[in-house]
Amino acid sequence: MSATSWDIIEQFVAALAAGGIELAPGQSITPDGKLHRVRLANDKAGQRTGWYRLHLDPPPAGVAGDWRTGCQVKWCSKRPERLSPAERDTLRRRIEREQAEREAGEQARHREAAQRGAWVWNHAEPASPSHEYLQRKRLAPGIARQRGASLVLPVVDFTGHLRGVQYVQPDGQKRFIAGMAKRGAWIPAGPKPDGTRPLWICEGWGTACALQAMRPEVCCIAGLDAGNLASTAIEARNRWPALDIVICPDFDKVGRQKGQEAAEKARARILPPTADIPEGCTDWLDVLNAKRQGVAHA
């Protein structure tokens, strides 16, 4: 590879880092114009949530993103004002073609994940009440099913379509079926949302179950994680413009930040932790369990 090619790759990687997409140590860039997956600095072992595409042909340009967060960075070796008309046209056609390819590939992955998720869900058994996670969290099985040692939870959207499933291990580790479409998706914890009762959106299924138990007059769902709260809340708002929507994030810094963002974007209220939350509680499920144990002020 020529020195010029190495320079282009270095500039591309630097632009990604500046835009919030940092590659994991040892990851290399292949500038062949094809879509590649790559490990990011904050990926766990075995994860490759990053993707990129880099062209060396004039004008050298690329794009990269994080499938987990939706963050995306575009880069070109030339400033827009320095591109010739021919280069602008080449770049525009390239971007349009690659965007169409990327969207088609993403839709195919989503369809496959939904099909695999449906198979898993249909072949799972009702969850055992003695499952270690349920016992430790003091949760009833509810809608949960089980395959082997894993709890299986359905991930759906507001049309009722199954997007995929979430697996919960006995130790509490969670993962979604690969390729699943997360935006706007959720896990039910009680009655199906229909716009007739306030909708409370939590992060995890256990927390949604806890709030549903504490507030049976509302409808609680799990928005999957802090980063997905906004998209789920916005989908609900678009479906029910006048509905009372309440965001119920976890108590950590990320939860508070993402919860506030979701509330603002969806014109919703937020349920903040009260001043008398027992020490050590990180979400409303912890609060419910502390209350069951008779912890002072719970």
What are these regions (language model features)?
Residues 1-10, 197, 209-298:
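TOPRIM fold recognition
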Residues 1-132, 253, 257, 264-265:
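Non-catalytic accessory segments of DNA primases and related replication-initiation nucleases
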Residues 20, 138, 143, 215, ...:
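Glycine-centered loop/turn motif at secondary-structure junctions
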Residues 26, 144-145, 273:
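Residue-level detector of family-conserved "landmark" positions at structurally sensitive sites
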Residues 30-34, 149-152, 275-285:
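A short acidic, often aromatic-flanked loop/helix-cap motif at beta-alpha or helix-coil junctions
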Residues 111, 150-240:
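Phosphate-handling DNA/RNA-contact segment within nucleic-acid enzymes
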Residues 131-148:
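Short, basic/aromatic recognition patches
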Residues 141-145, 163, 246:
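Phosphate-handling catalytic cores of nucleic-acid transaction enzymes
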